[in-house]
């Protein structure tokens, strides 16, 4: 009697409309079911039958119901699909094309076809770029994608690079130069400094050399420094085709094994590069560093010609200063340049230690990759004294540029860092107080107070406290007007020393030149700083993704079973520990199941960065632990580790 009853139908509709809804992100599992994460602390169960219409990462609205005394959700409306433009691997079955998205947790085949503009022919195992066109939660009967581009084939040894670049929609080739791009456009009078003994210090294999230095000592102990920077804007006119290309790339993209330059290589590695014994146009800055380490107020920017007398390597210069190895400078004059630069470096380090913020020495890892993409080894590179010589010289040059721009026109591309926002400043002060470190919010939100905090933390040298405070800090950014850089400890900072590889430095070059030539300066638009930040983010993600891929290949070929690795804990997540292997820099994940067998007794406290078992703290961020590798998953580029420990009672 209730069949086709309009009143009952209306009642069901009313009940359905009044049922609570929740919004969140779908998280799938390997066992078919999933969860709808509405915030970091709350999630709802999605049964396997309800997972068929959604994908991991989809942002949805779901109907909240109760089934067998358990709250579950039923996906109802798609807000934003996880997949839009994506990369994946082609599978061919019965002459039909499918694509498997290259993302963890996405394993299902998606039906696909090349779109009308794609001329590629796809084979099994090819890698491709695709666009999701149909989604089941939108009412479509299947997930469907259009192939827009073939990335490469299955046997290409450079798959990690090409797929990653395609994933982040980054260029994979250098821009092409036309004949006119290689002709010097500026006819300005330049100072002839070709007789001075300028030197460059860089990695042995560096070809795009931006900076050269010349120093001399004064009788009163002050040091005169001329920083000469390659001048690509003398060849590339504002608004030209090549300038537009550079403004889109923003940076040279440095990936493990090779780079994709912002400018054509015959400009960046030859015509503009400050190669030894080659006459080159430069934008130069004459700075005096006083014997107490301060920078003199008298700063001069000018155009010049120089001829670098020698290309030196970081290791050779460091060895000679540290009196190890057999290398000696090629001439007495160059030896003298190194000695004065070393003195300048020590003066500035002493000054920055007292008045600004010093960086902690960190270990860097570099992949040694063959021309054919084979990973030969992972090398540890430490910052040595020659690195610090160049670093201190560039910092002096960038402070000088910021001051010069601010004084003359009041704008440019500035690197800024705001320290703490108000909420995080309060959290930081509360955290510090628990370690008997007494600071006020007012104090640490000033540049002077922030620098003092960083100096205190450097003296304490507690990596856990340091990591927690960094978590409260703001991110670095760019600004078109002067602003402080708290993390460096300077009232203003503007880079101009890498115009071959950074478009922001090219912008500052043009502004500095407009001041020198007494021409009208055009303020950069606000949109450019957003483009710079976004491109930097994408480049960094690409570097991380390629590295993760190469580490899985590298370690899979090693006999890692039962080998113990020292590791540093870098993060605590909801379900495990992230750590970095000290030996080679690989990031590993330690799931809770490999830490303690009873999940209910485990507490991963992300807020404090600690792991508790039965209320007792066992691990925290910055701890050094020993691990073994239990699984290396090439498909998801993840390395699973487990701690070396005695079983918990």
Curated annotation (Swiss-Prot):
Domain S1 motif: 562-644
InterPro entries assigned: CSD, NA-bd_OB-fold, RNase_B_OB_dom, RNase_II, RNase_II/R, RNase_II/R_CS, RNase_II/RNase_R, RNR_Ribonuclease
Cellular component per GO, a single term: cytosol
Pfam families listed in its UniProt record: OB_RNB (PF08206), RNB (PF00773)
Domain RNB: 190-517
Protein's UniProt keywords contain Nuclease: yes
EC code: 3.1.13.1
GO BP annotation list: mRNA catabolic process
Compartments where found: Cytoplasm
Broad class of the protein's primary localization: cytoplasm
Catalytic reactions on record: Exonucleolytic cleavage in the 3'- to 5'-direction to yield nucleoside 5'-phosphates
Membrane as UniProt keyword: no
GO molecular function terms attached to this record: exoribonuclease II activity; RNA binding
Keywords of this entry: Cytoplasm, Exonuclease, Hydrolase, Nuclease, RNA-binding
PANTHER family referenced in this protein's UniProt entry, alphabetically: EXORIBONUCLEASE 2 (PTHR23355:SF37), RIBONUCLEASE (PTHR23355)
Function: Involved in mRNA degradation. Hydrolyzes single-stranded polyribonucleotides processively in the 3' to 5' direction.
NCBIfam families hit by this protein: 3_prime_RNase (TIGR00358), PRK05054.1 (NF003455), RNase_B (TIGR02062)
HAMAP family, sorted: RNase_II (MF_01036)
Similarity section: Belongs to the RNR ribonuclease family. RNase II subfamily.
Protein name: Exoribonuclease 2
Protein source organism: Buchnera aphidicola subsp. Acyrthosiphon pisum (strain Tuc7)
